[in-house]
Amino acid sequence: KKIFKISGLLALGTFAITGIGLLVYNLRPVDIKSKADELEAYCKTKGYNADYGILVDYERNSLQKRLFVYDFNNDKVVMSSLGGHGSGGNSTVFRADFSNACGSHCSSLGHYRIGRERRMYNRPIMAFELDGLDRTNSNARPRAILINAGVGPLSWGCISLPFTRYAQLSGILEGLPKNVIVWAYD
């Protein structure tokens, strides 16, 4: 019995240390301000919504907040969230592989225009359609890449948020006169 208790404690201790190590992996400071300034300039140049923008920092792992809704007028983050990425390729919870290929189940980098909010495949889950604006994400519509409420850190390429954060995002985007841009970068 003692050997099993000691073995169990050692295993638990190893798991705890490893888990803590994985959670702090890539805990670098987030330079949201400079990325937000770049996104704001892009939005103004292209004629998109210059009030809000969404940044997705795929350099951070999916156990960290990496989706940021930025209010350009007040120069601040108004929402931050965990954000899942695609499970395709060699993606893990800690690192995403990227592809624009149909059927890849990978996330794609680049700028997206947020489209209409709709039900996700006749289920009670809501989602925002995304239009890829760059060569790296031009297949977003054919691939059905969305921002959706979801469970877990991996998706089929969509940007998935916890349900409460999705509801908050929906509230922010509701009634805005122009399309908001998402910029996913690594």
State where each predicted segment sits.
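N-terminal Sec-pathway targeting helices
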Residues: 1-14
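Hydrophobic alpha-helical membrane-insertion segments, chiefly the h-region
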Residues: 13-24
